[in-house]
Amino acid sequence: MTLIKSISGIRGTIGGPAGDTLNPLDIVKFTSAYATFIRRSGASKSNTIVVGRDARISGEMVKNVVCGTLMGMGYDVLNIGLATTPTTELAVTMSGAAGGIIITASHNPRQWNALKLLNEKGEFLTAANGSEVLSIAEKEDFEYADVDALGKYTEDDTFNKRHIDSVLALKLVDVEAIKNAHFKVCVDSINSVGGVILPELLDALGVEYTFLNAEPTGDFAHNPEPLEKNLGGIMDELKKGGYDMGIVVDPDVDRLAFICEDGKMFGEEYTLVSVADYVLSKTPGNTVSNLSSTRALRDVTEKHGGSYCASAVGEVNVTTKMKDVHAVIGGEGNGGVIYPESHYGRDALVGIALFLSSLAHKGCKVSELRASFPNYFIAKNRIDLTASTDVDAILVKVKELYGKEKDVTVTDIDGVKLDFPDKWVHLRKSNTEPIIRVYSEATTMEQADELGKKLMQVVYDMQ
């Protein structure tokens, strides 16, 4: 089954039997449930919902179904067209809308699409609110508008420029320093909306650029997740010389990865670390990332006199914790930068502008900047279990086993994380498959993988 319903939205592959895939029937039901939730919440007096989408092949079809359904529910639709996830988030607050729907399957392959749901603040729904939407959808507890109360449809393509203007207006984005540095970059925008908005951003920053996979066709030239194994094309281009760096985004431009001038990966985990180091050097404070993210952020934060906090995995969990501890920056180790001075959402445009500002101020090569940070390696493994396995019971046993050791700090807000003095391992169950994901980090890849494999064996021995 490739239809996945969760508190953050609904996603699946296009085509196939109703109920098993992302199809018009389920899109109507889920959109209707969301509109019902927004109206009942009463959080906004607005009668407008923003809709934006990435460049996926199925995006036009899904957009038409979503917009028609919202109008049928009596909501006015503000369609901002091809837009990044952060652009759509900002459009909600800029337009004073009651909420927003982002049509994107993020880094998933071309046959996937999804609906991501926003509240009146342009932020993802909380777990409680997401559960309420699921409940409404399950019960089909919604009522459509009569003929005199149908919503209106409006298009507005100005939000890309408004997003860029908001980035340029950030105090820590030093436009003049970036222009004076005369950077030349290579960008892989993976045939989606990054190819629409990033040239405009780089033009405004005075950066010379070459784009790979620029056309927003949705026919991705390679696996769209911005990992080293998928980025051979741009890495080879960098190795030819003549560039200061490479920039890679995912299809909805909320994840960001850099490539050094020599064609080597900067490291997706270090996107947030490097941007945070710059922000903290100017505005000291606290930081947040999720439990599966590199310890390097903690090290950099403490270097600047701040405190680091970890949250459960998931953007809404990160932003909630950031608000709790008044973090000046946060995000996720997958290249997600969240800068509250802009908005509480992962934003590659903000990340690019802050990174280039830092590089311009330091006057060093990207590889030299990377070498200035603590070096850690993360290994990723998985434990395959049977459907009848009590995963929660296994995680409790792991917690009890290691909770007795004096040099181990145990965290159980999201699975079980074991923090040792010089390494850590995080065991987290999947919500959609009978597996436990195992993330481990140490100062060498061998040690990280060894720690992960050790915990995998501990789990196998418990069955």
Per-region residue spans from a language model:
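N-terminal small/polar loop signature for handling phosphorylated ligands or for N-terminal nucleophile
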Residues: 36, 48-112, 200-259
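Short beta-strand-to-turn element immediately C-terminal to the catalytic PLP-Schiff-base lysine
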Residues: 117-120, 257-261, 338-340
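An N-terminal, well-structured beta->alpha segment
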Residues: 1-68, 72-73, 152-185
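Gly/Ser/Thr-enriched, mixed-charge loops and adjacent short helices
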Residues: 13, 113-239
